[in-house]
Design a protein with these regions (language model features):
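Conserved beta strand-loop-helix elements of the APE1-like EEP
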Residues: 132-135, 160-176, 204, 311-327, ...
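Active-site beta-strand/loop signature of hydrolases that rely on acidic residues for catalysis
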Residues: 57-63, 92-123, 168, 201-203, ...
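A well-ordered secondary-structure block
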Residues: 36, 146-210
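Solvent-exposed loop/turn segments at secondary-structure junctions
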Residues: 65-66, 115-118, 144-148, 173-174, ...
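Surface-exposed cleft-lining segments at the edges of enzyme active sites
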Residues: 80-86, 114-116, 182-190, 217-226
Length: 355
């Protein structure tokens, strides 16, 4: 009996030490970006020149790391699956790449949830693949998720992940920055969550001002209104600061909230609508700024089950905001029926006034 107790105590001690060692390792290797970081621009060698054209096309798309296509549900959204098969993930990525490669008329592409290396996407370097596809373009990648091991769900842990956001431009980028959002959780939870951010890219214009494009991916799964307000102020203060200098400002991406007063069109392209838990406050930006979205089709679907059109609740979380010195010509959701991502792309056409 005494021997059994000693063995049991040794096992318990080993488990405790293993757990402490794991937490210590994750803490030591935790990704800790600065509030503002200068980012490297990838692309062909070229001198930065003044942007002459005043009419521009942009597209934003959360590609769901090529892991959340129509066949998938997701454990974190009350589904059961953690990752697709390697074959399925490759199919999603091929289709996503094909779509992006076909956007010849689009000047700027803002992607969210794109992996450099992660178990959830079978270690495919999605950033490199997209960059090679768009080899005549300029791009900036910023990490917002880097963890050595995510231990959930316990029956099939997500494991290693290194992913983030990618801004792609047809024009040379004069400067690029990563701006960190505040952490939404305390230790130890923060060790396993995204380090949210937005990417700022700058382009000089012929009139002496800059076009400033912000690629954002705001927090999900946050019910504390004060945390969301704090996060939103980071980007809106930057937007207002740039506009006060006479610059042209475009912010787009996955805001994880409905735009102010959003109501879907009657048909909604055959989709079932749900109102998101979080609604963007109309007063979060000054009067004169434009919320650029499309109410004819959704950009996001719920992942508690595989996608069936008309059954899964859908909504819009992806859109643009443009400054008062920009005319919005068109905003359109490109309805891909969530075949390769749990988000649809949003496209806008704009015109810079007095450039």
């Amino acid at each position: 009996m005494k021997k059994f107790i000693l063995v049991l105590l040794k096992i318990i001690l080993i488990l405790i030490l293993t757990f402490i060692g794991f937490v210590a390792y994750i803490t030591i290797t935790d990704y800790r970006p600065d509030d503002i970081e200068i980012m490297e621009v990838s692309g062909p060698q070229a001198e930065v020149f003044e942007l002459q054209q005043d009419t521009l096309n942009l597209l934003a798309w959360n590609i769901g790391y090529a892991g959340l296509g129509a066949e998938m549900d997701f454990f974190y959204d009350k589904g059961k699956q953690v990752r697709p098969t390697k074959k399925m993930s490759r199919k999603y990525l091929n289709n996503i790449s094909k779509f992006i490669g076909e956007q010849d008329s689009v000047d700027f592409i803002l992607l969210q949830e794109i992996d450099e290396k992660a178990r959830r996407s079978h270690h495919a370097n999605e950033v490199q693949e997209i960059r090679e596809l768009m080899n005549n373009s300029y791009s900036v990648f910023a990490k917002n998720y880097h963890c050595q091991f995510i231990p959930v769900p316990v029956y099939e842990p997500m494991g290693y992940v290194r992913g983030g956001m990618l801004t792609i431009s047809d024009f040379p980028i004069s400067k690029a920055e990563r701006h960190a959002y505040p952490l939404i959780a305390s230790w130890p939870n923060k060790l396993f969550l995204l380090d949210r951010c937005f990417i700022l890219t700058r382009f000089p214009l012929a009139n002496g001002k800059d076009l400033v494009i912000l690629n954002t991916h705001n927090s999900a799964y946050v019910t504390d209104k004060n945390l969301r307000i704090k996060e939103l102020k980071i980007i809106t203060n930057k937007m207002k600061e740039e506009f006060s200098k006479g610059n042209y400002v475009v912010a787009g991406g996955d805001w994880n909230a409905n735009p102010p007063g959003y109501e879907p069109a009657d048909n909604y392209n055959g989709h079932k609508f749900f109102k998101s838990e979080v609604q963007m406050d109309l007063n979060s930006i000054p009067e004169g700024w434009i919320w650029a979205y499309d109410n004819k089709a959704p950009t996001n679907r719920q992942n508690y089950k595989s996608f069936v059109k008309g059954e899964n609740p859908t909504t819009i979380l992806d859109y643009f905001v443009v400054s008062p010195n920009i005319e919005l010509i068109k905003a359109e959701v490109i309805d891909l029926n969530f075949q390769d991502s749990d988000h649809n792309p949003i496209y806008v056409k704009i015109r810079l006034r007095n450039n």
